[in-house]
């Protein structure tokens, strides 16, 4: 079932086209990685999907509830609030009374229950991303939308976060749409890749994406995907 459907999406600021005639769909259960150079319209697309931007042209249908993880720098982390209180914000608007057992269970799922009473400002980048994931999960989403979740997180933290994300999306049957600058990680983790450069440059299952198409807009593409199975396939080591 198509859980997201976008047709002929165009978005302008004054006369400048940020997105032009973008058409795609997302099937339920997919893990979609959105890549593209700086200024390609990736974050704009995410903001349209989550409803932050309304004045676009075209058709956007989202058939399910979205849980959203914005970029790390967009979240004010100096508020005097604890980890469990921040996570519980994902339940606001759904319950008159916070289900603290559910909050604690979700914090346990993402591996930070031991931090539940700590101020959020004391968390590392990786820990805060896990907390943001917990908050999004507490809204009981059908779709998780993530905007550069690896930003500000070290390599070990990235690998751990993606392992967690993949496990939870399978357990909870959640569709994931993720913007990332870490192209190697996208090719390793995502089932589907969408490359934006204001228009839709290419889109399809990860194994069908041709590196030659991406090299037109990513000069260091081979470096970014080196070590992934995709790199081995397209450099002749698995073609037989």
UniProtKB/Swiss-Prot annotation:
Coiled-coil blocks: none
The entry's keywords: ATP-binding, Nucleotide-binding, Transport
Domain ABC transporter, chain residue ranges per copy: 4-223
Highest rank taxon of the organism: Bacteria
Example of a GO MF term: ATP hydrolysis activity
Matching SMART domains: AAA
Record-listed ATP binding positions: 36-43
GO CC entries: ATP-binding cassette (ABC) transporter complex
Pfam family, one: ABC_tran
Claim: Nucleotide-binding is one of the keywords in the record: yes
Annotated PANTHER family: METAL TRANSPORT SYSTEM ATP-BINDING PROTEIN TM_0124-RELATED
Similarity field: Belongs to the ABC transporter superfamily.
Described purpose of this protein according to its UniProt entry: Part of an ATP-driven transport system TM_0123/TM_0124/TM_0125 for a metal. Probably responsible for energy coupling to the transport system.
Protein name as annotated: Probable metal transport system ATP-binding protein TM_0124
